Design a protein with these regions (language model features):
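N-terminal ligand-binding lobe of clamshell/alpha-beta domains
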Residues: 20-418
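Bacterial Sec-dependent N-terminal signal peptides
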Residues: 1-29
Length: 418
């Protein structure tokens, strides 16, 4: 079985490399490298090159070590979104950069960036990734953020308030909206990388592309497996540095912390899933509410759809095969979900919505059994760090859904309130 897995990984890497031949900094003919095992992430492949004498290049006089991170395009099967060459800082890393440059080829089919690691200054456009960096022990790397009003991390707010104070330690600059970031502020930050969310048919990043700063396209949110998204922290751990292992002025890697954190999350998630499977099928759960004329609900193979399945809850679209959201009409939802036991949704800002307010929004809500029984659960994402915590901690959201489906034998709800 293990041999089959290795062969499969090798074939996958070969296909990814073939789809990205002719890149700006080719790892190409150096060595095949060792592919890291990714149990759940389908969009990320990491290949490590170099580990002592076996990979020393006698002709080049280099004992090289570097890694490749290959990000598959979530919106176009069989193609690459981005390729990253992670090369350690320091003298040996400088030699590796020069070696790869001499092997450079042309006619790139996908974007490739060389990133010197560990990254010690970064603009981070995504709140969950800011939270993750705190957990990995590298919050000082965050030097700029976007959409500050939507970030529920007290220390980020505190450090952002110190922006402009020349005596402040590790202040954070508000770079404006992630859809139209303040380029001048980003230039002033002098970041070593920019971390952002890619979107389908975005057409690139405009002026950001012209800064010649590596753009880390965090496509983790497109993973359908809850643990698949969390597993991306292994990549981010390789990218960023912490103060603990600092040597010769260069930060230590967050990679060991990321690996151990993911192992802990995986163990807890699988334990909860196994416990939930031991109970009878739980209550039926409907998520979200109407937006305009559309009611968006998770597809059966989406992250939330899989979480509901792993919670052993009933879900009206559990047989659906889509991995993204389903855009349904309110009439379609009511026709299929009138008898749902629990209605759980998110909102932003203000007091929890009363039943009267919900009916003002849409009178059809009164047709839901969960509405009439008062089984309405809400989470205010303006005050509760829901996205910040659950994006890379699916075990927290799994526990939440288990409680909603099976009662409080697993404890009290952390995010949703009745």
């Amino acid at each position: 079985m293990k041999k089959q897995y290795i062969l499969l990984c090798g074939a996958t890497v070969a296909l990814l490399m073939a789809a990205c031949q002719g890149e700006k900094t080719a790892a190409a003919d150096a060595d095949a490298g060792d592919t890291l095992e990714m149990k759940y992430a389908k969009l990320l492949t990491i290949v490590k090159h170099g580990d002592g004498e076996e990979t020393s290049d006698v002709a080049e006089g280099i004992d090289y070590q570097y890694a490749e991170a290959l990000v598959a395009n979530p919106w176009k099967a069989g193609t690459m979104l981005h390729r990253y060459i992670l090369i350690p800082k320091g003298e040996e890393g400088d030699k590796t950069v020069a070696m790869l440059a001499r092997r450079r080829s042309t006619g790139a089919r996908c974007t490739t960036d060389t990133v010197r690691t560990p990254v010690e200054r970064s603009a981070v456009f995504i709140a969950p990734h800011c939270q993750l960096m705190y957990e990995l022990g590298c919050p000082q790397v965050i030097r700029g953020v976007c959409d500050l009003d939507y970030i529920n991390i007290p220390d980020v707010k505190k450090r952002a308030a110190l922006s402009g104070n020349t005596s402040a330690q590790n202040p954070i600059v508000n770079c404006g909206s992630s859809m139209a970031p303040d380029i001048e502020r980003i230039i002033a930050l002098n970041p070593e990388a920019i971390l952002l969310s890619p979107f389908e048919n975005s057409g690139g990043y405009g002026k950001l592309d012209k800064l010649h700063i590596p753009i880390i396209e965090a496509a983790d949110y497109m993973e359908s497996s809850p643990l698949g998204r969390a597993e991306w922290m292994k990549f981010y751990g390789m990218l960023f540095g912490n103060e603990e292992g600092k040597s010769n002025g260069i930060s230590g890697s967050c990679e060991p912390k990321a690996d151990s954190l993911f192992a802990k999350i995986e163990k807890e998630y699988l334990s909860l899933k196994a416990q939930a499977a031991g109970y009878r099928k739980g209550l039926s759960i409907l998520t979200e509410r109407k937006t305009g004329n559309v009611w968006y609900v998770p597809g059966g193979q989406s992250t939330i759809g899989i979480l509901l399945k792993d919670a052993n809850a009933r879900y009206i679209f559990e047989d659906d095969q889509h991995s993204g959201s389903l855009a349904m009409s309110p009439e379609q939802i009511l026709a299929k979900g009138k008898q749902v036991d629990v209605w759980a949704f998110k909102y932003f800002g203000g007091a929890p919505l009363s039943q009267a307010q919900l009916l003002q929004e849409y009178d059809g809500y009164k047709a839901l059994a969960a509405f009439n029984r008062g089984n309405i659960y809400q989470v205010d994402t303006s005050t509760v760090p829901y996205f910040e915590l659950t994006s890379f901690h699916p075990e927290l959201l799994l526990r939440e859904f288990i409680i909603l489906a099976h009662g409080e034998r697993f404890g009290k709800l952390r995010f949703y309130k009745k």
